[in-house]
Amino acid sequence: MATAVAEALENEQHLVVEAGTGVGKSLAYLVPAVLWALEHRRKAVVSTCTINLQEQLVNKDLPLLRKVLDREFEVVLWKGRGNYLCPMRLQRAIAQSDGLFTSPERAELERLRGWAETTADGTLSDLSVEPDSRVWAEVCSEAHICTTKSCGTNPRCFYQQARKRLIAADVVVTNHTLFFLNLDGSADPDDNDAGGYLFGNDFVIFDEAHTVEAIAARQLGLAVSQYGLRQALQRLYNPKTKKGLFQVLRQADAVRATAETLDRVEEFFDRVGERSEFSEKKREIRVREPDYVEDTLTEPLLALQARVVQLVRDQDDEVLKGELQDLGRRVRDARAALSSFLKLDSNDFVYWVEQTGRTQRTHTLNAAPVDVAPYLRSLLFRGGRTCIMTSATLSVGGEALEYFRNRIGAEAVPGLQIGSPFDYERQMKLYVVAKIPDPRESGAYEKALARWIEHFLEMSQGRAFVLFTSYKTMQAVAAEMRERLDDLDYKLLVQGESMSRHQLVSEFKKNKRHVLFGTESFWSGVDVPGEALSNVIITRLPFAVPDHPLVEARLQRIEARGGDPFSSYSLPEAILKLRQGVGRLIRTRSDKGIVVILDPRVLSKGYGKAFLNALPRCPVEVV
């Protein structure tokens, strides 16, 4: 793998590599990447999906490489601006605190002032308790406020200091979302060289590349949320607290206009909710016709934006001017996205409304390209550059990475597959349960699930991930099993109840009798080596919900082009997801354990063999 990466860099070519768990793929791409960066004065950008892998690269792999190579090189973990405190904005917020904040928020501001004097890097991760989001929004770095001109000479401006290190770095570690957010060159706007992606002289390596398609679709699309628009406007003026920037400026007319616009926002999104036929099972509704609801927001948003522009012109205070300009841009961007959504601007996009929240429901207008391949082909796989994609799970079984390469626009890019060195015949056993109802018989299936989960938990004495495809099913099974598992002295951890994903994994590792119930985010990117995880239970084959608007649009496009939506999309996507879930179990050469599939379709359906053939070769027992 290292040789293939070195050759791709040498020849300014692209590469897709599937490297099985245990290959040591991070070092295999880091060694040639670092050497190439140093010898050719280039910048290596390594993008991952998870924080875990970023931390592994920065704290373990790259320091090890520094010792082995006996070469000095600069590494920066690149975080988004919103993670950094801006001292200039903090001082402005303190000076205007009476007009901006309520009493509890002012107490929070004081806590941040004390922390700002002692923090080493000024980022959210350095705070022991996450700050109030409203307060943090007033003091974090913002692109048009915290600039090189306003903050560049301040040694305590954490973002500007980080930016200097970023530009000087040999290796930049970041995440996929931030990468695509900055793909227009805004990472280093002073560097206009067209020879790279973010910095002019860079090349990029995407690890955990199986997530690139989904993340790119989000970043290339649009989203206007009721919550986000409300938060932005309330920074201008919040009628409930009677605080905000217009209150500081004593602009009575602007205060009234903002309060009225906030009412229009709530009314508009209420109409969106009424127009959409949501249910407990259906939280996303596809929009197929323009003017889904009447556009009653553009006019008040435009009027509010005009007020902000006028106040900017009248303002002498550069800091306040920057704050107004930033909020004015947010209003403008929301207005443009709203207009694009209501017009259904692009035939290549799918549009939908999403409902979130269980008690206080809010709505988001979404749009995303049905197919990201044409976009990524031109953005990433251009001539004279090097983009390397790698992951442990890119293939769907004997097809030379063709499916993945087609999905991301890398059809012409060479592919390389390297198998895992692990001895799965010895380390892993697969159980497939035939004596269980079809998952589509939900009532009988859920009752049987609890019985079979308990059976296999006894076999491994807990120490298990139980992976679900439905949050609702997970909650129902957890409620049914909680007391019984407690009696058996297993500690049940359930995603979404109280702890974050990171906290759940950390807690899981502490006790050998833990059982963790998880959905989407636990199928991949979670690493628990050793005895703590000895059992992975797959409750259902992970087919994507076919009526999710984006999935539905992709299936319809395949059908319209004469293809078979099931074999061309639904099945390969589910196979990849299953491979990722099963891949949680064996992380080192000494790991041992069992994988359980509680879905009889893997035996009863013709496509079942495709799932089994895509898994590592190991002993299989049907029960």
Each predicted region: which residue ranges?
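Conserved RecA-like P-loop NTPase helicase motor core
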Residues: 433-444, 496-602
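A substrate-engagement module of RecA-like helicase motors
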Residues: 38-172, 177-180, 236, 241-251, ...
